[in-house]
From Swiss-Prot:
The keyword Acetylation is assigned to this record: no
Region (Gag first part): 1-208
SH2 domain segment(s): 248-354
Domain SH3: 368-428
Pfam entry (one): SH2
Region (CRK): 209-437
Transmembrane domains' residue ranges: none
Protein name: P47(GAG-CRK) protein
GO terms assigned for molecular function: receptor tyrosine kinase binding; signaling adaptor activity
Length: 440
């Protein structure tokens, strides 16, 4: 325990500065996490897989008991761990040795020289050293984690050669972009196949978020689960009137039109529409984490049976209607929206309905301000709203709703969102401009 406290304290002093928590506060937090069964060992805190469950549990505890001390400490510790991870300085036993003054090389970000890795890695926990091979460590990585090169040992990370390799001159991998995710989210915890899709149950699996690669609709977190939003933002409750159905219900709106209305809007902007494939059901479409997510809302009768379609949300009738989203049941759509004003769907709460003025308008660059970019890497696209492209493609920028994600159009007239780190601004030839502007 003491060794882990020293490591975490040193990391916090490096990345948090004067706001760094004390060793006493870190120790109290670790004791609580072990008591609650969130950590089998204090050193498990180094694993990114433990961060989301810890955040969810401490957030729920703070809101239920009004005790936010451990949550505040965890926020600082998490920030330090994420900062180290983003700089490719993951908390390993080698870095622990460095911080504790026990020797060992400090993890360095990849440079132009040959990138290397150690043959073995050891973890320090209560004086015990446990050997772990590189192959074993790589096999334990989560599917969404990115195996980034790091320099610690004496053999090349890619080919294993001690000297004389040419890996340093190989093509660099595409840069990371906002939304790709450095560690798995809680969005997929407890999900079952067929839950939360805009297709009949069992037709497709729900996706865990940008970068997961699955298509279809999503399932929100369960009751009481409060998922940490991107960037650690505080819980924000919506100010809209859930009883004003005209502000959020759009009727028979297609999925594509919903994406067009919500793409680029602030997190938490939403609308409710009729399901296009399951009559009588609805879809909650929400702008969150640089994408548009779609959550299926099943309509149930008094005995749990399916309701006939065409009645609209909460339409009066002889039999009361209930609404199922994920594993939560509500008496009406307004009560469902009220619930998600203060509970996270995945990374956001419901903040406001999309404005009706968006229906016939769009924010598009004026002709004299049109910009073009050239693709530096291939991009396959992870969401329905993404625009796939190949290295060397010329794209026309239509608008810039976010700093790291722009809305673009390719030479075939297809439109969608592109990651800014994957492209560079350019001045295409007149022939390319003619093609992109419709002169084909």
């Amino acid at each position: 325990m003491e060794a882990v406290i020293k490591v975490i304290s040193s990391a916090c002093k490096t990345y948090c500065g004067k706001t760094s928590p004390s060793k006493k506060e870190i120790g109290a937090m670790l004791s609580l996490l072990q008591k609650e069964g969130l950590l089998m060992s204090p050193s498990d805190l180094y694993s990114p897989r433990s961060w989301d469950p810890i955040t969810a549990a401490l957030t729920q505890r703070a809101m239920e008991l009004g005790k936010s001390g451990e949550l505040k400490t965890w926020g600082l510790v998490l920030g330090a761990l994420e900062a180290a991870r983003e700089e490719q300085e993951q908390v390993t036993s080698e870095q622990a040795k460095f911080w504790l003054g026990l020797g060992g090389g400090r993890v360095s970000p990849p440079g132009p020289e040959c990138i290397e890795k150690p043959a073995t890695e050891r973890r320090i926990d209560k004086g015990e050293e446990v050997g772990e091979t590189t192959v074993q460590r790589d096999a334990k990585m989560a599917p969404e984690e990115t195996a980034t090169p790091k320099t610690v040992g004496t053999s090349c990370y890619y080919c294993g050669a001690a000297i004389g390799c040419n890996c340093a001159t190989a093509s660099a991998p595409p840069p990371p972009y906002v939304g790709s995710g450095l560690y798995p989210s809680l969005a997929g915890v407890g999900e079952q196949q067929g839950q939360g899709g805009d297709t009949p149950r069992g037709a497709e699996q729900p996706r865990a978020g940008r970068g997961a690669g699955h298509r279809g609709l999503r399932r929100p977190a369960g009751r009481g689960q409060r998922v940490r939003p991107a960037g650690g933002a505080a819980l924000m409750a919506g100010q809209f009137d859930s009883e004003d159905r005209g502000s959020w219900y759009w009727g028979r709106l297609s999925r594509g039109d919903a994406v067009s209305l919500l793409q680029g809007q602030r997190h938490g902007t939403f609308l409710v529409r009729d399901s296009g494939s399951i009559p009588g059901d609805f879809v909650l479409s929400v702008s969150e984490s640089s994408r548009v997510s779609h959550y299926i809302v099943n309509s149930l009768g008094p005995a749990g049976g399916r309701r006939a379609g065409g009645e609209g949300p909460g339409a009066p009738g002889l039999n009361p209607t209930r609404f199922l989203i994920g594993d939560q049941v509500f008496d009406s759509l307004p009560s469902l929206l009220e619930f998600y004003k203060i509970h996270y769907l995945d990374t956001t709460t419901l903040i406001e309905p999309v404005s009706r003025s968006r229906q016939n308008s769009g924010v598009i660059l004026r002709q004299e301000e049109v910009e073009y970019v050239r693709a530096l890497f291939d991009f396959k696209g992870n969401d329905d709203g993404d625009l796939p492209f190949k290295k060397g493609d010329i794209l026309k920028i239509r608008d810039k709703p976010e700093e790291q994600w722009w809305n673009a159009e390719d030479m075939d007239g297809k439109r969608g969102m592109i990651p800014v780190p994957y492209v560079e601004k350019c001045r295409p030839s007149s022939a390319s401009v003619s093609t992109l502007t419709g002169g084909r």
